[in-house]
C-alpha cells in the first residue's frame, strides 16, 4: 500500500471532496485511517501526474466500497454543507480534484452502471414525494456508488452539451444581453434544452438526472428533518449572492437554512443553472464535490461578506489553504486534519504530532495569520525530501553512536582507518540529507522548466475555477429544491414534474453582476473541461491506444473541438509536461512529479554527485554507480518487455482496420508467410502511431515510432511487389530462370525501381514513394523483363525467403551468434554455430525438414535482401541492425558440410588452435627460465634426441595398431599428434623454446614420459644407430627453405628412388590452423623418419611439404641399412 501511495501522490490541497467524506465518518481514528487510506489511494490518481493510469485505478476501486455508515452520513450532510459553504472564496481549496475526478469517472463508469438507478426508484406519485425508507435506500453501498456515478455522468454530459451550444469566445457583455433576451422571451426553455436536438440522448439523460438529483437531495433534507425535528433552523442572510458564513462549532445537529426566498431581492441569488447561457450544469445535478464541508469553520465568528465576481474568481483561485484548517465536530467525532489532507504516511505522522501538541480539546484551532505555502511545487519538494530522508535512514550504515576521531585512529591499522573513514563519511552524508529533509525551505531545482511551472499554475487555477463553477451550480440547485420542499406542504407540489422543473422561481431573478459571473464561468468551464478531456485523451492514447473509445469522442463536439485543436497547436509542449513520461537515464534531481522508481534512480545519482563534490572514496562512488546502473538495466528490460506485452494486448483488444492492412489482406492471398509479415508490421504500426485526430497523440509517442512506421511502409511496399509478381507469374509459362538473371536483378538496381509508383499500383504508391530515394525497394519486377519469364515456384520461394529475412530483421540480431565466438575458451565449433542459425531461419519459412539446396538459396536471397541495401538508409538504428545482419550472413560458409562426419575434425581443429594459443603465451618466458643459451647446446641436442625417439616409437605403435583404419584417418591422427609440439629459435640458432602438453595420458598422443628419461646431458643416439661423429656437428636447421627448381627435381627423384611395390601407400597431409603454428622443418623430419622407421617404403608427401623436405632428402645416404648424415643440414 505504501508503494501505491508513492505512485498516487498528488498535491495535498486537492482532496477536498475526500476530506468531506472523511469528516463525516463516525468511526474511530485508527479504523478510519485504514479505510481512508485504502479508498483515497485509489481515488487520488488524476491520470496526469501519476504513473498508474486512470482506468486501472478505477477498476481497482470497484471492490473497495465504503460502508453504509459513510454514505448515510454523507447523504445526511450533503445539502447542509453545500448551503453552509455558499460561494465563499475559501471553498476553492476543496475543489482542485474535480476536473480529475470527472476524467476518472468518465474512464471508469460504464453505461451499464446507470441501470440500477432507474426512475422508478424515485417516482413522485399524487403530487407528493413518495420517499423510500432510509433502510431501503441505504441498503447497499453499491446503490449509493451508482448514485454518485450517475450524478457525475450527468454533470459531464450536460457540460459538454453547454459547450456545444455556447461559443466560448463571446464577450461577456454580449452574453449578458443575450441571456437577458433569452430569459425575458422564453422563461421556460433553457439553452441546454435548445441544444437537445443536436444530441439524440440528451432529453433522456436530463429526465433521469433531474429525477435522480431531486430525489436524493430531497431525501437528504427530509431525513435530516426527521432525525432532528426539534432543532431550530437558523437562517443566515447576507448582502451578496450565496456567500454564507457559519458558526465555528458546526455539528451534525445544526443545519443552517438557506435564504428566505420570499425577500425577492435580486442581489441574493444566482440565476437558475438550467436557464443560464453557459453554466452547463443541471439544476438538480449533484457533482462529486457536493459533500463539501466548510474549510473555514475554525473561525470564531461569522465570515466576512464577499462578492463572487470575476475579480474574486480570479484572485481566490490562488489562495492557498493552510494545513491546520479543518472542520470541528463533537469531541467524539474530531478528526485530524492530516487525515483529511494527506495520504502519505510521512505527512500523516508529521501533522498528527503537530495537532496533538497544539490542539486543545473542545476548542477550534487558531486561525493562521499568514496562509502557509501549499502550492504543488512546495508539496513535491517536501515529498521528495521526505522520501530522501527515509531512504537515507534506510541505507545508513549501522555505526555506533560515538564514532572514533583522528586521535584514536593513529593506533589503528591501515585497513581499520580506511573503514572508519568510510563510515564517518557515509554518516555525515546521511546526516546532511536528514537535516535537509527537516529544513522548512526547499531549494529550487535549476533543472525545473519555467514553462512547465507556468502550465502547472494554469492547471491549478483551472481546477479551482472549475470547482467554483460546480459549487455555485450545486448551491443554486440545492437552494431551489430547499425552497420547493418548504412550500411542499402548503401548496400542492407540482415542481417535480418535468415541465415545471425548468420554470423559474420569482426569487431567482437575474442581476447584471450574476449574469456576467455566469457568462465568465461558462467560458472558463468550457476551457477547463476541454483541457481536462484533452489531457485524459492524450494519456489514454499514449499508454493504451484506446482509439475507438477515447480518441473518437462520441457526439458532435462542434466548436469545442476546434478550440482544442487550436490550443494543441498554440501550446504544443504544455500537454507533454502534464503527461510525464519518465526520461531515460537522466542524472540529477530532474523529476517534477516523483514516483518510486524516479526517486530511486534520482537518489543514486544525487549520492554520486555529493560523493564527487566532497571528495569521497572511489569505491563508494563505484558502488553507487553500479547500483544505479543495475537498476536502470532492470528498468529498461522491464520497459521493453512491457512494450511487447502492450503491443500484443492492443492487437487482441483493438484490431486496427486501415487501408494499408485491408489492401494487404486483399492482395496477399498466395503466400501464408506474407500474412505473417503483415501481422508483425501491423503490430509495430499500431504501437507506433494511433489514428487519433488530436495532434498531441502523435507528439507524445515513443521516439521509435518513426523508425517503426518507416519499416512498416517498406515492408508494405515490398509485400505488394512480391504479391504482384506472384500473381503475374502464376500464369506465366513454367520455364526456369537462369541463375545469372536472378543474381543480376538482385545485385543491380534497374530502371523498374524508378517507375515503382506506376508498377506497384494505386494502393501502395503512397507507401513506396518516401523510400524511392533510399533504394529500399526490392527489384523483383525486373524478373519479368527477361524473355524467358519466370517459374511460379521460384517467385514463391523468393517471397518466403524475403519474408523470413524481414522477420529476422524485425526481431533483431540478438539471437544470432557473433563470429568472434569461434575462438572463445568454450570451444564453440562450426557445427554448433551453424545448427541454431539453420533452425532460426527455417522456423519462419517452415523449411526445417530441408537443409540442403533450399537453405543454400535462402542464404543467397537473404544476403541480397533488405540487409544488403541498408547503407542508404537515413536512420542509424536501422543501419546498424541491418549491418549486423549482413555481417552475420557473410560469416556463414557457402559450402555443404556433412556435420555428422566432419564434426570430430572441426572439434580437433578448434581445440588445437586454442591449445596452441595457450602454449604460445607461456613460451615467451620459457627461454629465460630455462637458461638455455650458448652453453646449453648439449642439453638441447639430448632433448631433441629424446623427442625424436619418443615420437617415432609412439607413432610407430599407432600405425601398427591401426592397420585396419583408413589411411586418411591415421594420417590425420598423426598430423594432430605432431601439432602438439611447438619449437622456436633463439638468437644462437639452438632449440630453446620447447613446450609439450601433458594432458593426454595415452601413449599415442603425447610425450609425457619424456621428462623422466631425460637427464639433461646424456643421450641415447645409439638407439637410432647414429655414429659418434654426429656429436661434432651442431644439430641446427636453417630457417630459410630453398625454393629452387633443382631442389624440387631432386626431391622427386629421391622420392621415386625409395618407392618400391608394397601393400599400402601412406599419404602424409598436414593441416595448418594458421601459418607458422608448427616448425615446418621439425615436422617434416619427424614425418619422414616415422615411415622409414616402420619400414614403410611407399609414402607420399603433399606439395607443400615437398619444399620443406627437399633440403633434407638431398643430404642423406643409405649405407648398409644404417643412417648417416653425410653433410650439414
From Swiss-Prot:
Region listing for PKA-RII binding region, in residue ranges: 905-918
Region (Disordered): 1-21, 354-376, 394-416, 434-455, 962-1061
Ranges of biased composition (kind: Basic and acidic residues): 442-455, 1002-1011
Keywords, comma-separated and alphabetical: Peroxisome, Phosphoprotein
Biased composition, class Basic residues, residue ranges: 1-12
Subcellular location: Peroxisome
Positions with biased composition (Polar residues): 404-416, 968-995, 1033-1042
Known function: Binds to type II regulatory subunits of protein kinase A and anchors/targets them.
Annotated GO biological process: cortical actin cytoskeleton organization; positive regulation of establishment of endothelial barrier; protein localization; protein localization to endosome; renal water homeostasis
Tissues expressing the protein: Expressed in brain and testis.
First and last residue of the signal peptide: none
PTM-bearing positions, type Phosphoserine: 434, 439-440, 595, 835
InterPro entries per the UniProt record, alphabetical: SPHK1-interactor_AKAP_110
Domain notes: RII-alpha binding site, predicted to form an amphipathic helix, could participate in protein-protein interactions with a complementary surface on the R-subunit dimer.
Biased composition (Acidic residues): 1043-1056
Gene Ontology CC terms: cytoplasm; peroxisome; protein-containing complex
Protein name: A-kinase anchor protein 11
Annotated source species: Rattus norvegicus
Principal location listed in the UniProt entry: other
Comp. bias intervals (Low complexity): 1012-1028
Residues bearing PTM Phosphothreonine: 251, 363, 742
Amino acid at each position: 500500500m505504501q508503494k501505491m501511495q508513492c505512485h498516487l501522490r498528488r498535491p495535498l490541497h486537492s482532496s477536498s471532496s475526500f476530506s468531506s467524506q472523511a469528516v463525516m465518518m463516525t468511526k474511530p481514528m485508527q479504523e478510519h485511517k485504514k479505510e481512508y487510506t485504502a479508498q483515497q489511494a485509489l481515488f487520488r490518481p488524476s491520470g496526469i501526474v501519476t504513473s498508474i493510469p486512470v482506468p486501472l485505478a478505477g477498476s481497482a476501486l470497484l471492490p473497495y466500497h465504503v460502508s453504509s455508515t459513510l454514505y448515510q452520513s454523507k447523504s445526511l450532510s450533503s445539502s447542509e454543507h453545500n448551503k453552509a459553504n455558499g460561494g465563499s472564496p475559501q471553498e476553492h481549496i476543496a475543489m482542485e480534484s474535480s476536473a480529475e475526478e470527472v476524467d476518472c469517472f468518465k474512464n471508469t463508469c460504464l453505461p451499464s452502471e446507470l441501470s440500477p438507478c432507474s426512475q422508478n426508484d424515485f417516482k413522485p406519485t399524487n403530487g407528493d414525494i413518495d420517499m423510500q425508507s432510509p433502510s431501503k435506500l441505504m441498503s447497499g453501498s453499491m446503490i449509493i456508488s451508482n448514485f454518485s456515478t450517475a450524478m457525475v455522468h450527468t454533470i459531464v454530459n450536460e457540460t459538454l452539451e453547454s459547450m456545444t451550444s455556447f461559443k466560448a469566445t463571446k464577450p461577456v457583455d454580449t452574453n449578458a444581453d443575450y441571456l437577458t433576451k433569452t430569459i425575458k422571451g422564453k422563461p421556460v426553455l433553457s439553452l441546454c434544452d435548445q441544444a437537445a436536438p443536436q444530441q439524440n440522448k440528451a432529453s433522456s439523460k436530463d429526465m433521469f438526472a433531474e429525477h435522480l438529483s431531486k430525489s436524493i437531495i430531497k431525501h437528504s433534507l427530509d431525513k435530516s428533518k426527521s432525525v432532528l425535528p426539534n432543532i431550530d433552523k437558523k437562517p443566515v442572510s447576507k448582502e451578496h449572492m450565496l456567500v454564507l458564513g457559519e458558526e465555528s462549532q458546526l455539528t451534525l445537529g445544526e443545519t443552517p437554512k438557506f435564504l428566505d426566498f420570499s425577500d425577492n431581492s435580486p442581489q441574493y441569488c444566482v440565476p437558475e443553472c438550467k436557464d443560464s447561457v453557459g453554466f452547463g450544469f443541471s439544476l438538480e445535478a449533484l457533482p462529486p464535490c457536493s459533500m463539501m464541508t466548510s474549510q473555514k469553520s475554525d473561525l470564531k465568528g461569522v465570515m466576512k461578506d464577499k462578492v463572487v465576481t470575476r475579480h474574486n474568481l480570479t484572485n481566490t483561485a490562488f489562495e492557498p489553504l493552510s494545513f491546520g484548517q479543518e472542520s470541528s465536530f463533537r469531541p467524539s467525532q474530531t478528526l485530524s486534519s492530516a487525515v483529511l489532507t494527506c495520504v502519505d504516511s510521512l505527512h500523516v505522522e508529521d501533522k498528527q504530532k503537530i495537532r496533538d501538541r497544539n490542539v486543545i480539546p473542545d476548542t477550534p484551532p487558531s486561525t493562521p495569520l499568514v496562509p502557509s505555502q501549499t502550492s504543488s511545487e512546495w508539496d513535491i519538494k517536501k515529498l521528495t525530501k521526505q522520501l530522501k530522508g527515509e531512504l537515507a535512514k534506510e541505507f545508513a550504515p549501522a555505526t555506533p553512536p560515538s564514532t572514533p576521531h583522528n586521535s584514536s585512529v593513529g593506533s589503528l591499522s591501515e585497513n581499520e582507518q580506511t573503514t572508519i573513514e568510510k563510515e564517518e563519511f557515509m554518516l555525515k552524508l546521511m546526516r546532511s540529507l536528514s537535516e535537509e529533509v527537516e529544513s522548512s525551505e526547499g531549494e529550487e531545482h535549476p533543472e525545473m522548466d519555467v514553462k512547465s511551472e507556468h502550465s502547472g499554475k494554469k492547471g491549478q487555477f483551472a481546477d479551482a475555477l472549475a470547482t467554483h463553477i460546480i459549487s455555485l451550480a450545486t448551491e443554486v440547485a440545492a437552494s431551489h429544491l430547499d425552497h420547493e420542499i418548504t412550500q411542499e406542504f402548503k401548496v400542492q407540489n407540482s415542481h417535480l414534474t418535468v415541465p415545471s422543473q425548468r420554470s423559474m422561481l420569482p426569487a431567482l431573478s437575474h442581476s447584471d453582476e450574476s449574469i456576467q459571473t455566469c457568462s465568465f464561468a461558462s467560458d472558463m468551464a468550457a476551457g477547463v473541461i476541454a483541457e481536462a478531456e484533452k489531457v485524459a485523451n492524450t494519456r489514454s492514447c499514449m499508454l493504451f491506444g484506446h482509439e475507438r473509445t477515447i480518441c473518437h469522442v462520441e457526439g458532435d463536439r462542434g466548436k469545442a473541438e476546434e478550440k482544442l485543436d487550436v490550443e494543441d497547436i498554440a501550446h504544443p509542449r504544455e500537454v507533454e509536461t502534464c503527461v510525464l513520461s519518465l526520461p531515460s537515464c537522466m542524472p540529477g534531481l530532474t523529476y517534477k512529479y516523483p514516483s518510486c522508481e524516479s526517486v530511486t534512480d534520482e537518489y543514486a545519482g544525487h549520492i554520486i554527485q555529493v560523493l564527487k563534490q566532497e571528495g569521497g572514496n572511489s569505491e563508494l562512488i563505484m558502488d553507487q554507480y553500479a547500483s544505479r546502473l543495475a537498476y536502470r538495466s532492470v528498468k529498461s528490460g522491464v520497459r521493453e518487455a512491457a512494450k511487447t506485452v502492450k503491443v500484443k494486448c492492443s492487437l487482441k483488444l483493438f484490431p486496427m482496420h486501415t487501408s494499408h492492412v485491408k489492401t494487404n489482406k486483399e492482395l496477399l492471398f498466395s503466400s501464408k508467410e506474407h500474412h505473417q509479415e503483415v501481422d508483425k508490421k501491423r503490430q509495430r504500426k499500431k504501437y507506433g502511431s494511433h489514428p487519433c485526430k488530436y495532434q498531441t497523440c502523435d507528439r507524445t509517442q515513443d521516439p521509435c515510432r518513426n523508425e517503426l512506421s518507416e519499416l512498416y511502409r517498406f515492408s508494405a511496399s515490398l509485400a505488394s511487389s512480391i504479391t504482384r509478381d506472384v500473381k503475374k507469374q502464376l500464369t506465366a509459362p513454367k520455364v526456369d530462370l537462369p541463375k545469372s538473371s536472378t543474381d543480376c536483378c538482385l545485385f543491380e538496381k534497374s530502371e523498374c525501381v524508378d517507375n515503382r509508383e506506376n508498377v506497384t499500383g494505386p494502393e501502395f504508391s503512397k507507401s513506396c514513394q518516401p523510400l524511392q530515394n533510399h533504394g529500399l525497394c526490392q527489384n523483383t519486377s525486373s524478373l519479368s523483363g527477361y524473355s524467358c519469364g519466370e517459374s511460379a515456384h521460384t517467385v514463391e520461394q523468393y517471397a518466403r525467403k524475403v519474408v523470413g529475412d524481414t522477420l529476422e530483421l524485425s526481431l533483431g540480431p540478438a539471437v544470432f551468434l557473433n563470429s568472434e565466438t569461434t575462438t572463445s575458451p568454450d570451444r564453440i565449433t562450426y557445427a554448433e554455430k551453424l545448427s541454431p542459425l539453420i533452425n532460426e531461419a527455417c522456423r519462419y519459412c517452415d523449411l526445417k525438414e530441408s537443409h540442403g539446396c533450399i537453405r543454400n538459396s535462402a542464404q543467397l536471397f537473404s544476403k541480397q535482401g533488405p540487409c544488403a541495401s541498408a547503407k542508404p538508409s537515413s536512420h542509424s538504428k536501422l543501419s546498424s541492425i541491418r549491418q549486423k545482419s549482413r555481417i552475420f550472413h557473410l560469416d556463414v560458409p557457402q559450402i555443404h558440410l556433412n556435420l555428422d562426419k566432419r564434426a570430430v575434425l572441426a572439434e580437433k581443429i578448434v581445440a588445437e588452435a586454442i591449445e596452441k594459443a595457450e602454449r604460445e603465451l607461456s613460451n615467451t618466458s620459457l627461454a629465460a627460465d630455462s637458461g638455455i643459451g650458448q652453453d646449453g647446446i648439449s642439453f638441447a641436442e639430448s632433448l631433441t634426441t629424446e623427442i625424436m625417439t619418443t615420437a617415432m616409437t609412439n607413432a610407430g605403435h599407432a600405425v601398427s595398431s591401426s592397420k585396419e583404419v583408413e589411411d586418411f584417418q591415421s594420417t590425420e591422427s598423426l598430423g594432430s599428434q605432431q601439432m602438439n609440439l611447438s619449437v622456436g629459435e633463439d638468437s644462437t640458432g639452438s632449440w630453446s623454446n620447447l613446450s609439450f602438453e601433458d594432458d593426454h595420458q595415452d601413449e599415442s598422443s603425447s610425450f609425457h614420459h619424456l621428462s623422466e628419461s631425460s637427464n639433461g646431458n646424456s643421450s641415447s643416439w645409439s638407439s637410432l644407430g647414429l655414429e659418434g661423429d654426429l656429436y661434432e656437428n651442431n644439430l641446427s636447421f636453417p630457417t630459410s627453405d630453398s625454393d629452387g627448381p633443382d631442389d624440387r627435381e631432386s626431391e622427386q627423384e629421391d622420392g621415386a628412388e625409395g618407392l618400391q611395390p608394397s601393400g599400402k601407400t601412406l599419404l602424409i597431409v598436414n593441416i595448418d590452423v594458421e601459418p607458422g603454428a608448427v616448425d615446418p622443418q621439425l615436422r617434416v623430419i619427424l614425418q619422414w623418419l616415422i615411415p622409414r622407421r616402420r619400414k614403410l617404403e611407399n609414402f607420399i608427401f603433399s606439395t607443400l611439404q615437398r619444399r620443406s623436405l627437399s633440403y633434407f632428402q638431398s643430404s642423406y645416404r643409405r649405407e648398409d641399412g644404417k643412417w648417416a648424415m653425410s653433410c650439414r643440414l
